[in-house]
Amino acid sequence: GYQAREEQLKVRDQKKAAEGNWFLSQSLAGMSLYVDRFAGTLKSMPSKLPHLQDLGVNFLHLMPLFESPQGESDGGYAVSNFRKVDPRFGSLEDLIALRKTMHEQGMYLMLDIVLNHTSHQHEWAMKAKAGDQEYQNYYYTYENRWIPNEFEQAMPEIFPESAPGNFTWNEEMKRWV
């Protein structure tokens, strides 16, 4: 939790909070990017920071980079482990090193962490499929199509061509997810 946060980051937090509406100040210019498409790996990112700073970028939003199933990553959004960086991008240590480098240079780092769904290989999904009611409650699951059909009336499909509908039948749970 926050108590375990590094002291220098707590000081930075307090300074920002003391500035009042700092988020309205236009002192931050952000950029979103995929690590692999911009720099290849997290270890390569520090060498790109001067270029970003030349552009006036001091706030970097990295698109999903946590472990997800090969070939089923949904662009990194089907996370199988929120505590592991996908090896294609590097390691958690590489991410921590990048964050430290950025902070030393007065830059901010934000991660795109998708908490509203997981991959079917995530620990929570595995426990839900094994019948653990606590973990089944982490997901919207239904025994029949009645409620999913109601959702489908107003909920736009994300991938209508490749994965039509917003619910999938899970044979292990015998439920719509």
Q: What is the predicted role of each segment?
A:
Residues 29-33, 60-62, 109-111:
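Hydrophobic faces of well-ordered beta-strands that scaffold small-molecule active sites
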